[in-house]
Structure formats: C-alpha cells, structure tokens
Amino acid sequence: MNTVSIAPTSSLRHLPLVSWLLAALLASGNAAAAPVEAPASTATPALIADKQIDAGDLSIGYADLGPAKGEVVILLHGWPYDINSYAQVAPQLAARGYRVIVPHLRGYGSTRFRSADTPRNGEPAALASDVIALMDALKIPRATLAGYDWGARSADIVAALWPERVNALVAVSGYLISSQEAGRKPLPPQAELQWWYQYYFATDRGRAGYTQYTHDFARQIWQLASPRWKFDDATFARSAAALDNPDHVAIVVHNYRWRLGLAEGEPKYAALEQQLAQAPAITVPTITIEGDANGAPHPQPQAYAGKFTGKYEHRTFEGGIGHNPPQEAPEAFVQAVIDATHLAHAKGGAR
C-alpha cells in the first residue's frame, strides 16, 4: 500500500461527513450555510465537451484530447461534478501521448437521451453500459478506465463484466459494486447519517428540493465530501452548469432510489444487475486511490483489496485530499493512470 503526499491545502484537521453536517446545522440551522474556506485561484482552462456522438440510448457529449492513435484512456466523473474534474488531468495525459476521452454522464452537460420515451434510468448497470456504448460508437476496442464516485463505480462494473474491453483500471475508493439487496439492509446509525442525501432523495420533498436548489445542494456536497479543498466560485460554477441538464434531477433521484430498492430498473439491464449482485472479482490491472480527507461515505481499502485479483496497488493521497482526487491532486492522479497502464503492459508486476 503506497502513500502519496500532496502539499497540504489547509491546517484544519479532517472531519468526516457526519461531523461537518452536524457542525453546519448547529452553527446556523441551515446546512447550506456551512462556512467555506478561503478560495484558491482558478487558472485552469475549462475542459470543453466539443464533440457529440450517438451511443446506445444517448447522444453523448465528450472531450477528445491527444493523438487519435494514442493508447486510449477514458475518464469518468462523479456526482455532483462534471468533466472539469479532469481539466488538468486530461491535457497532461494527452501531452504524454494518450488519447483521452472524457464524457458527460447521462443527465449531465451536453449528453442527451435520443428518445423522449427512454426511461430516465440511473441504475448502475445503465451507467456502465453507456461506457461500452460509447466505446463501440468510437470504435475503441480497449481502454484504460479511471474514475471517482459514480465514475469509479461505472469503471469497476465495466472492468468486472467486460474485462476484455479494459486494459487497466484506476478507481477512487476502490470496489464500489453493490446491489439492491445490499442497499435494502439497514446500516448502523452513524453510517446511515452519512447517507442523509440518499434518504432525502427518497422523498417527494427531496426531489422538489433538489430541483429547486440544485446548485446549492451540489456546493454543499462538495464542501462536505472534500472539507479541505479550497475551490473558488468560478471552479464550482464551471461544473455546476452541467447540472442544468434537463434530465439531471430525474437521473440522480432514480439512482439513489434504485439503490434502496425504491425504484425499478429497466428489464434490459436485469441480467447485468444479477451478475453484479454476486460481487464479481475484478481481474484487470488496477490502482485504487483514497484521499486522506474524504468526507463522503466510502469503504476502507483493506475491506476491498481482495476483490482485485490481478495486478494491484493501492495509493492513499495525503495532504487534505477529499472525494475528488483528479481535481484536488491532478498530478498524482495522472501518475496513477500512467502507472496503471504500465501495470497492464508489464509481464510481472505488483499484486
């Protein structure tokens, strides 16, 4: 297990999500009014999804950087973020000769459903199938996948169910494959509190609240999930614009309701979800990452290491790194992606 030290961004001690939520509530009576640290300057050019392609149920908006014949890396963002999590990572990888694809997930940015009749489905198998559909549309037989949050889950699923399509994997918070059956089981009270937003979305009030206060809600999640990340207003606004997608709220609410068994998926994904419910091992070369100040719910590395049965390394990013390592520690994330591709090419290697 490796530790990567990042220059500290704050002298504040890391607090878990629960502590930050309760502190904000006690201080002001309103979680949205949690104090924000002094912002850092935004100097990174935006990552523009200037390409569009029909892929499965979607017309996917994506950025495409680097040489057309370079080794392909697909970078997958999470909720409630967007492709600009990779605004520094993607150009650095492209400069090293990789072809880098960064798509907006369904319900984000310029990605749209091709039919008004398609269910606005956020179940994990659907999101992962979007990655395969994109690869097929772009005629990409194999790629290295890297992601965090929802993006890491999709990358995990693709690596588990379609290993022949994956050269290597970089997954923040490791093994995130689960099932509705697991989601129905109650957790200890402290763990349940960390998932407060999931239960909020299970209510009509939660859907209405997220619809009305999407940007405020997203900012609160950013602050809670990365309590020592000094993002500024411009950085947040650049990503928040992607949440104005007309299908965003529906996708997010369905995703979290599905996890609890409160919403059904689509029949065409049922067989995939049955496979995922067996918690399949991931055999492709993998580097997992965790930030030492991740305030979002996440598993401990020792709990999931055994799910990766191929070449494997784990890295902890120290120095106040939270839930969004590619944006909070881009150089270290770039190195992890490069090293994962090297694991894939090596005959021997780590386990």
PLM features: residue spans?
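Catalytic histidine-centered segment of alpha/beta-hydrolase-like enzymes
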Residues: 321-329
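Flexible "cap/lid" subdomain of the alpha/beta-hydrolase fold that forms the substrate-access gate
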Residues: 34-47, 58-60, 65, 72, ...
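Hydrophobic residues on the short alpha-helix immediately C-terminal to a glycine-rich phosphate/catalytic loop
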Residues: 89, 158, 336-340
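Short, amphipathic alpha-helical "lid/cap" segments that border enzyme active or binding sites
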Residues: 128, 253, 330-334, 338
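Alpha/beta-hydrolase fold catalytic core
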Residues: 2-6, 12-13, 18-21, 28-72, ...
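Conserved acidic functional residues
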Residues: 78, 149, 327-328
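Conserved HGGG/HGGXW glycine-rich cap/lid loop of the alpha/beta-hydrolase fold
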Residues: 64-113, 304
